[in-house]
Amino acid sequence: MHLTLTEITSQEVAAGLEDKTIQVGIMRPLALPDSLVVFELLNEPLVAIMRADHPLATESENGIYMSALAAEPFVFFPRTYGSGIYAQVLSLARAAGFSPLITQEAGEVMTIIGLVAAGLGVTVLPASYRRMRIDGVVYRNVLDPGATSAVWLVQRKDEQSPMAKAFTELLTRNVAR
């Protein structure tokens, strides 16, 4: 038995499942073909991340609405990166009445948060990234309805190897606890 963990984008997970180069994927929500099946592992809140000395940081200790970020420059993933969170954050911003001005783009979360710490803008990411302790930034819960991000386990409907099936059962059983 051999398990290989590889970090790839949500788009790459979907493509790998389709072309059968991977058997099981873990990803953020993204439009998927009918040949794939999804099990939601968890759903977590989104957080706005900004410099600790940002004016909104002190005003928003109990959370922040997306509309408060309308005039802020955003640091985010490139549209072409294939991250499932991209469309969700843009949708939340549009629902709040604005289109984010993305002034800096990076493909890695550590870089995005580092650029925020350098004062180049704000970002919105899943709350699990709070674990990345970077000096000079604060994390504020986004209060808008629907400001959560799911993590999916995804696989092909039509076939599963015994190992993929065992892995899926292990993950889903542990999540159900």
Predicted regions and their residues:
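Central regulatory/effector-binding core of bacterial HTH transcription factors
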Residues: 1-34, 105-106
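Short loop/turn segments at beta->alpha junctions
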Residues: 9, 65, 107-108, 126
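A late-sequence structural motif
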Residues: 25, 75-76, 138-177
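Beta-alpha-beta core module
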Residues: 34-40, 44-45, 59, 110-157
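Secondary-structure junction motif
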Residues: 62-63, 72-96, 161-168
